[in-house]
Amino acid sequence: EPLYEKCRLQKKPVTVMFIDADHLKYINDTFGHDMGNLEIRGIADGIRKVFPPEAVSMRYGGDEFVVLLPGCEKAQAESLKAAFLKALDEISKSLHAEFDVEASIGYEVVLCGEKSLNECINNADEKMYQFKKARKAQRE
């Protein structure tokens, strides 16, 4: 939250990314919790690999992550989202597991701190669910 407040005071844009591990319950139930942990670690590795050093990332829930990106506007956020999803594909291939490391991602770009951090997280979460739903429909 201090980073978010700093961006608000400096009137800088900030992007809040919400990332959800896909199929974690299925992976845990089918392959065991060690494999579920492998998916979580794969997502964390993707975050470290793709997002810039000034980004602040945190595990938000059992299978969710939030990443704050100071000074990040929409075009850069879209580029980082694509790079993150590509990184997960590469991580999946390197693991040779019986499942793919996949995540759904949504983001909210806020200019001049016009919303609270909680509002941004909730909006990014909603956009993540829209992404998840659209990808599921595309695969069917």
Question: What does each of the following model-derived ranges do?
Answer:
Residues 29, 78-85, 89, 93-96, ...:
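Catalytic-core segments of nucleotide cyclases and related cyclic-nucleotide turnover enzymes
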Residues 1-16, 22-52, 58-62, 66-67, ...:
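Conserved long alpha-helical elements within nucleotide-processing catalytic cores of c-di-GMP signaling
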Residues 26, 67, 88-89, 107:
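A near-ubiquitous, low-amplitude feature marking generic local secondary-structure context
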Residues 67-72, 109-111:
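Short beta-strand-to-loop capping motifs
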